[in-house]
Amino acid sequence: MQITDVRIRKITSEGKMKAIVSVTFDNEFVVHDIKVIEGQNGLFIAMPSRKTPDGEFKDIAHPINTATREKIQSAILAEYEKVKNEEETKTETEE
């Protein structure tokens, strides 16, 4: 399974959630609403989830092993940093 596209759909500087991302696998399957979160130990991803009636959050889709999670997280965070740096450069040149 290959990650064929990572799209940063929304970037925010407020709060702990920094971005919302969509990831495409093998040009055939997409997972939307993956969040980039800033935690105590740096950035990490949170898979799409829904709130259950008892207030607990359950993942809708998620990797079932650590290696796959790390592969997805690395691809997302690399694209996030790239897009964030492009936006910062664009803002600086407009000033």
Curated annotation (Swiss-Prot):
Which Pfam families does the record match to this protein?
SpoVG (PF04026)
Q: Membrane-spanning residues where? A: none
Disulfide linkages recorded for this protein, renumbered to the chain, are none
Whether Cell cycle counts among this entry's keywords is: yes
Give the UniProt keywords, A-Z: Cell cycle, Cell division, Septation
Give the GO terms filed under biological process for this record: division septum assembly; sporulation resulting in formation of a cellular spore
Q: Which PANTHER family match?
A: SEPTATION PROTEIN SPOVG-RELATED
> What family is it from?
Belongs to the SpoVG family.
Q: What does this protein do?
A: Could be involved in septation.
Q: What is this protein called?
A: Putative septation protein SpoVG
What organism, scientifically named, is this protein from?
Clostridium acetobutylicum (strain ATCC 824 / DSM 792 / JCM 1419 / IAM 19013 / LMG 5710 / NBRC 13948 / NRRL B-527 / VKM B-1787 / 2291 / W)
